[in-house]
A protein has these predicted regions:
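Surface-exposed, charge/polar-rich loops and edge strands
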Residues: 1-198
Length: 198
């Protein structure tokens, strides 16, 4: 099975750039222009060198008490406590951070096959009604630092299992935005350095 992932909007950006450049070219120039092609990397999903990393969420300008009440209303079978549940079988578990407090949130009435999808469904609904903006953050330490501010609420997500990827696409369709990252953020400088094509 082959799959195409559009990480960091790479393919969408490449297509948009190409369509803009193409307008300035003759058909002969367009036929041989390097921007016509997207650089891709073919990898084996199960290769040990390919590491999945979670992409966490931080909601800026939010109220922790309102967020907790909203979580309890959105998920019907929910457990929120300062310690992780002893038995997590059949549960999706993530961590909520606010003002130095850590709460473990576990649910059984998941909205997606992946924990990140269930949380994203909640955040999408919550932010339709309440104030705040969400950002997608790499690294536990960064989330913990941001959530020392009492107006920020962070959600630490588990690393998605590789064997859940295709199953989730079958069950849920498209993956939620920013589901996972392949590698650590500090190792991905090439995204910034490899953008310019003339």
């Amino acid at each position: 099975v082959s799959a195409v992932g559009d990480g960091n909007h790479s393919l969408a950006t490449a297509k948009t750039c190409w369509n803009e450049i193409k307008k300035t070219l003759t058909p002969e120039e367009a036929a041989v222009h390097p921007a016509r092609y997207a650089l891709v990397e073919v990898v084996n999903l199960h290769d040990d060198s390919l590491k999945f990393e979670p992409i966490h969420r931080v909601v800026f300008g939010a109220d922790a008490a309102k967020m907790t009440v909203a979580l309890a209303g959105f998920f019907k079978d929910i457990f929120i406590a300062p310690k992780p549940p002893k038995d997590i079988a059949g549960r999706q578990v993530f961590v909520m951070l606010s003002n130095g407090n850590k709460q473990y949130v576990s649910v059984t009435d998941e909205k997606s096959n992946l924990t990140v999808g269930s949380l994203q469904a909640f955040l999408d609904e919550y932010l339709k009604k309440e104030t705040g903006t969400v950002d997608y953050i790499h690294g536990d330490e960064v989330v913990e630092r941001l959530c020392k501010n009492p107006e920020n609420i962070g959600f630490l997500l588990p690393t998605p299992a590789k064997d859940e990827l295709f199953k989730t696409v079958v069950l849920d369709g498209a993956l939620p935005r920013k589901t996972f990252s392949m590698g650590h953020a500090q190792d991905k400088r090439f995204y910034l350095e490899g953008r310019k094509i003339r």
